[in-house]
Amino acid sequence: RFIISEIEVAVKLKADLPAGSDLAAAEAAIESIHPVIEMIGNPFVDRAAQSKDLLLGDLQSNGAIVVGPAVDNGIRAELATLPVSLSYDGAVAHSVEKGANWEDILKALSWLSTHAEGRGLGLKAGHVIITGARALLARGDAKEIEGQLGAWGKVNCTITG
């Protein structure tokens, strides 16, 4: 069961990003920027009994990623103060106006290039990399989920089960 929705900014790679890549190489490897919904699932019988570290979304409770259409690269200049909203069933449930700026995202990609390669999971052309939750909230029984990245673009999905 999907229990939390997170609205994120993601990048899609057009080229492999080898270990040790600097910021310029990271930027050159990016094909496009996308709005994304990360759906956090609950793999635990008793979620409340788990440690906070174990409840982190990435690689532990990630249930699905929904990737929206690419947005214009002009979004890069606004990322630090970008209004981002998460809507459930047509009503805004959470919104923020802050997040990682473009340089922060490039630094994270540079770091991730080495970290991923060290784990045998190099960053390859075509990979979509999420860059951290901006707006997030427990889903409850909501069926329609939408994420809005200011005036730049949106992503949505419908829960059917």
Predicted regions and their residues:
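Catalytic-core "active-site belt" of small-molecule-metabolizing enzymes
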Residues: 1-103, 110, 138, 144, ...
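A conserved acidic, glycine/proline-rich C-terminal tail/linker
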Residues: 105-140
